[in-house]
Amino acid sequence: MGILAALLLFISVLLHELSHSLVARMKKINVESITLFFFGGVAGIESEDLKPSSEFLMAVAGPLFSLVLAGIFYLIYIFDGNGVITAITFYLWQLNLILALFNLVPGFPLDGGRAFRAILNAYYKDLKKATRIAAAVGKIFAGILVFLGVLGMFTTTGGGLWFVLIGGFLYFIAGVSYSQVVIKDILDKVKVKTLMRKNIKVLNGEMRFKEFVNKLANVEDNIFLVDGKLLNAALVQSVDGNVKLNQLAVSIKNLKVIGSNDTAYKAFKLSGESGGAVPVVERGKIIGIVTEGVLMNRLAWELKFSGHKGLHQHKKIKH
C-alpha cells in the first residue's frame, strides 16, 4: 500500500508540473526540461521574455491542478467504502492540498512567487525589479521555514530538518533566479562583435597531436582553427599521439554557434555547452570566438560599476 501511495504521489507531482508545460505549449512557449522535487518541480522554459499574462497563467496552472486532484481524492475518500482505497486517498488528498497551498506562497521561485512576479512585472513594466521583489519575499519565506525547522528540531523528534533543508534550498534558488535576470539584463545590451576575439591561431590539419603538444605546451590559448574547423584543446581527452589534428577538430555543423550581432547573453548560455568557448560564424565560416573568461570579466565589470540592487558577488551558475 505504501509503494502504491508513493507512486500516486509522484504521479500527482508530475501532473502538477506537466500542467505548467501544457499552458506553456498553449502559449507557444518551448519547454526544454522538467525537474521534479519532493515539493513540486521546475519547468525549464526556453526564454525568460514572457508576457506577464503568460507567466501568470503558467504559474497558477500547477497549484490549481493540485487543488483539483485534492478534490477528486477527497471525494473518493468520503464516498468509497474500501479500506485500502480510503487510506490511500486520505493521504493523497491532504498531500495534494499541501502541495497546492505551499506552491501558492507568493515567494519566488514557488509558483505563487512566479504569479506574484508576473503581477509586479505587469505593474512596473520592469522584469528585473519584479524579480527582485518576488525573490526577496521568497527569501523571507525561506527564512521562516528555516526558523521553524530549527525550532522543530529542538521541540520534536527531528522532523524540523526537512524545513531547514527546504528553506535553505528555496533561499538559494531565489538568489540564483534574481542573478540570472540581472545577468540577462546586462549581457542582452552587449553585442558579441564587441567581445569576440578575431585572431585565432591557425594550425595545419596534418599535424600530429604529439607534435601539437610539444610545440604548443606553453601556449595559454586553447582554441585553434584547423582546416576551417574548431579545435578546443581543453576538450581533448586522452588520444593517440599520432592522431591528426583535423580528426580532432569539430566542424561548424556540429557546434553551438552564434553570429556577431547576437547578444552576449546568448553566448553566455551557450558557453557552458561549448567548453567555455563559443565560435562566431558568418556566411558559414568561423570569424571569431567568444570565451567564457571574456564574458565573465565583462559581467564582473558591469556588476561593479552599475550598482545592481540585491546582487552579491556572482559565481558561475547553470544556465
Predicted regions and their residues:
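Helical hairpin unit composed of two closely spaced alpha helices linked by a short loop
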Residues: 229-235, 241-247, 251
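The conserved cystathionine-beta-synthase
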Residues: 201-220, 226, 239-242, 256-276, ...
